[in-house]
Structure formats: C-alpha cells, structure tokens
Amino acid sequence: MNPIVKTFPYGQHTVTIETGVMARQATAAVMVSMDDTAVLVTVVGKKEAVEGRDFFPLTVNYQERTYAAGRIPGGFFKREGRPSEGETLTARLIDRPIRPLFPEGFLNEVQVVATVMSVNPAVSPDIVAMIGTSAALAISGIPFNGPIGAARVGYINDQYILNPSVVELQESKLDLVVAGTAAAVLMVESEAAILPEEVMLGAVVYGHDQLQTVIKAVNEFAAEVGTKPWNWVAPAANVTLKAKIAELAVAAIGEAYRITEKAVRYDAISALKQRIVAEIVAADETQDAGEVADLFHELESDVVRGRILRGEPRIDGRDPQMIRALSVGTGVLPRVHGSALFTRGETQALVACTLGTERDAQTIDEITGERTDRFMLHYNFPPYCVGETGMMGSPKRREIGHGRLARRGVSAVIPSQAEFPYVVRVVSEITESNGSSSMASVCGTSLALMDAGVPIKASVAGIAMGLVKEGDSFVVLSDILGDEDHLGDMDFKVAGTSEGVTALQMDIKIEGITKEIMQIALKQARDARLHILTVMDKAIGVARDDISDFAPRIHTIKINPEKIKDVIGKGGSVIRALTEETGTTIELEDDGTVKIAAVSGEAAQEAIRRIQALTADVEIGRIYEGKVTRLAEFGAFVNILPGKDGLVHISQITDERVKDVSDYLKVGDMVRTKVLEVDRQGRIRLSIKEAKRDELPAAESVAESAPAQEAVVEQVPMTE
C-alpha cells in the first residue's frame, strides 16, 4: 500500500484527503476528514455502456454508520436500515452538482457511495462527503468535467462565516451550501431568516470564492495520483439525420409549442414524434429509432429556446416576467384543522394543516443522537397529477427533497413553542403539476397555516425562475413551466416574505452563470413574489383568531414542581386515570407546567379542576366536604382532597360523648369537616363539630393554594 495524502486548511478546519489504503478494488476511493469527521467515498464506473440505453445511470448513495458517533442503532435488529430523510437529502446534495458535469453522450453506469466513518458533532459530514466525491471522481479516470468544490456559508453579526460549526449554525441567520467548478456556481441550497436578496447573493459569491481552495487542492491531489483518463470518445453528432428531421418536423414542432394546454400539447408532440420516427425508419431501415427520437427532442429544445431568445412569446403565450393566473382558496376541507387550495396555471397544491400536542412531535434518530421536531411538512406527488399511472408507496427522493425545500421556505415564520404550544404537521398534495410544484406548496402551506389559526409571522410565497442562454444572449423567465425547466439552463427557486428571502435553491446545467444573471433572477423573483403575496393576502392575510372546532385546545396551568408526583401517582396511576376519565391529553414539564389538550372545553375544565384539587395544599381553618373512607375505634378517616385523608377524632364528631363511631358515621358518608391542624409529618386533624359551629359554607371553590390557570389557547372566531 502506497497511500497518497493531501492536507490543506479550509476556513477554521483542516481537511485531509487520502487514497491507496481502503476500498482498492473500486474505480476510485478516498477517505476525507475534517476535524475528526471522516467520510469514505468510493466511485465505481462500468467500462461499457448498455446497448440501447438512452439515459445516464448515475446513482449516489450516502450512508451514516452509528458507530461513527459511538452509538448502537435502536430497534429490534440493532443495525442501520433504509436511508433516513437526512441521508436522502445529503445524497441529493451530492448528486445535483456532479450530474451536469458528466459529458453529453456518456451513458456508462456510475455509482458513488459516501459512508460516514467518524463524526465530530461540531462538523457536519455533508460538506466532507461532497469534497470526497469531487476527489474520488477526479482520480477515477471517468470522463468528468470537474472537479467541484463545496462550502457552507453562515451569516452572523452581518458577517459571512465559512463552514460554521453546528453550534454557530444555531446562531446564524443563514445556512447556505454552494457547490461549483472553478468557473461557475452549479448548485445552491439554503435556508434563511428573512434576509435581503443582496445578502443572499453575497453569500453565494462568497461561498464560490472560498471553495476555490478545495478545487485547487483536489487538482493537486489528482495530479499526484496520476490516474490515466478513460479512453472514451463522445459519439459524433449525426448532423445529416438531424437536418432531415428538421426538414420534416421543425414547422410542426413550432405549431405544437403554440398549444397552451399541457395535455393537448403533449399529445400533439407525441403523435408528431411517432410519425417522424416511422417515416425515417421506413425510408431507411438502418436508422435507429432511438437516435431519431433523441434528435427530435433536440429540435424541440432548439425551437423553444430560439423563440424565447428572439423575444417571441413563451410556450403558453406569456412574456418572460409574466406570472400564470392565480386561484387561492382556504377552508376547502370541512373537518380539517386548516386547508388551502393554491392554483397557479396548471400547477395545483391542496395543502392540509393538522394541530397536535407535544406527544405528536416527531422523534428523529440522527447519527449524533435523538431530537424532536414539532413542525413537519410532507409533500406528495402522485402520478395522476401529471396524467400518468404509476406505483404508489413510500415517498421517493424527489418528494423528500421538495418537501424539505417547502419546509425551509416557511420555517422562518413558524411561531416558537412559547408563542403557540401546538405541534404542526402540513401535508401538500400535488393534484396538478406543470412546473414549480414545490413553490406552490410553499404558498399553500402559508395559507393553510393561517387558516388553521397558526400565528405565523408573515405570509410566504415561492416562485421558480428559469434561464435560456446562448453565448452572451440570455433571458430570465419567471414562473417556469415544466417544459421550460426541462429545456432551459437553470432552475432557480426563491421563497420569502415581502421583507426578504427565506429559502433559495438553484440548479444550473451550464457554465457561465454570472453575478449579473443571478441579480436579474433575484429581482424578477422578488417582483413575482410580491405579486403572489398580494393575491394570497386577499384570501387570508393574517392567521384566524380561532383554531378549528375539531382541533384540540391546549390549556396551560402551573403547579408546584414538588406536586408533580401527586399528579402522576404511583406507577402513573393518577395521570392515567385522569386522561382516561376526562378524555384529555395531559403533559407535565419539570418546571411544573401542565398542558391539558382536549377538543371539548368541558373535559379540559374537569381535568384542570381535578389537577388543581390534587395539587392544592390543605389550609388550616378551612371547611372541606369529604367522604368517609375508613372507621376506627378512635375516630374516622375522611378524604378531603384527592390523595389527602384526615382524621376526625372520636371527640371531634359531636359535642355529645361518643361510644361507637359507627353510631354516627358510615363509610361513604359525605361530611363537612374543618381543618384543625397539619403536623410536621403532614397528618391532618379534622373536626365535624367545629365545622357545624362555623357559619362559613363548605369549600366549593378552589383553595387559595391551588395553581392558577396561566393560559388557555382558545380564541374567538374571525368573521370573514
């Protein structure tokens, strides 16, 4: 073994890249470490492509091993299972910047596997895995127009921070990951606390400048390894065949792309393609039908892009900055806590919001330990939304990624637990799709949250921008269609409020995206966002004053922390009986905060009354009405409060001389007693005869020592 090692400083960290020790049968393998966070990245490429394949089969797998953090997995099998949501998102983060760098026509299967071997809780493994992927591809010999660099950018005290630690990220107003080559930005993924566009753009530029350190180090590392590149030659373009197809189809393609309705347009294009393929193959049987179809698709791209660059109307007749027709509705599902239907052109999201209690929070088992999440956003993309049939089941990578992007878009406006003590789950059902369904989910989520009475800080809207660029000519498109996304050069998604950006995602398919282009895109995105927010605010501009009648009301009271054990009872018997008998959900916190959740107000008040009784102190001189629980020769025991029995001595039953207690009292009798004394051991002395002498009524109200009800999340409905 002859290991080759490259070490370089990167921000506040030191990065080490090593090869030649592990996974030597892979096409390439590197171990990359950053301050004790270590990731093994392997690349395997097939030398030959499968005949007839018309797509590039790239697979990226990212896996976290719990031993990396000194932990044993939970569950029955005690081993890692299917990828978590976090692992899936990191795999997508690695995939997106490298996929466009494989050359056109390269169809050999390639698999990238990144395995976290050691983790420092302060250093996230995702950037390490991205650096490792770049280095492994650079030394693999596989055709690849890299290397890439990757950087995380934070924003603290108006300063950009390179690769902030996990602790610093909690303070940061920005979490932005940028990846790119020496010449261009390829991918951006970010979440922000409502920051201005210029701050977001500055972060992208700053990150791209800093990641040049990685690219330089990887180039030096690859030169030292010295792997020979594969002897692969891109297939020659069939210019003659493309000209023949153009002669037969260009005019018809142009007409088809004037059809504004997606389904009708697709049918026309499909029929035209089948006719052209059949004609050419019939005229020359040596022609490959797949090649004809591919060249036909290239012509589609040429027609659509050329029309946009010439200033002609887009596919659906809009100009570059025009937004499709909007339709907004709230409260569309009668028994759902909050709902909205957001439609933009042929893209539609039905969004539902559900309110729950703390026990509904999601427990997430991460490599560094467990955490709970009180806000969930799930995105579903069924096949019917694009007029297709397909398998239904667990969410795919795309659905997980789009759901996380939508969540990033609204996270900045979600109220804290102190402001709104509910756990919130939002589900976005995409019922129609023709571009930017994730941004429709952002808009629908904002509306559904307000419809549910969640006091979000501001309305949030999202928009997807596109780009068509040839040479120095370019056009930035607002609110792109699915075809414009597919045939264009950039997918640039921006979510935010009227004050600033909350999320930015960018995927670029070409090099040469300048700062000027990004500035124009952000400016158009802001204009579009403000237009959409105006329409949304007409439907519902602030959160409803009342939550749904079908949602649980959360009532909060405070008790003496020393009394928590009285509410719980032995083995949880008391609190279990309370919840079962009142039909409520009760949660206790160490500081004595008690949260009672119930759909019925009467049930909640009954639970509160019983908790107050359980935790109230016995007051000397106060009269209580209680039940006789036990008789003894020397007196009777009376239960005056839950869990609190006192003794009525035989001499305190009546003024007369009592020979036998049972002559005056029986078990189960309700009697009025006065508290005479509570001794140091907590024993309570009661008197029936003193209570009779006292003219005060029995204690029907809560004792002064009982806890006060602090807050009730119960509001008055707002009329529309």
Curated annotation (Swiss-Prot):
The gene is pnp. Keywords: Cytoplasm, Magnesium, Metal-binding, Nucleotidyltransferase, RNA-binding, Transferase. It is found in: Cytoplasm. GO terms for biological process: mRNA catabolic process; RNA processing. This is Polyribonucleotide nucleotidyltransferase. Its EC number is 2.7.7.8. It is an enzyme of class 2 (transferase). Involved in mRNA degradation. Catalyzes the phosphorolysis of single-stranded polyribonucleotides processively in the 3'- to 5'-direction. The lineage of its organism: Bacteria, Pseudomonadati, Pseudomonadota, Gammaproteobacteria, Aeromonadales.
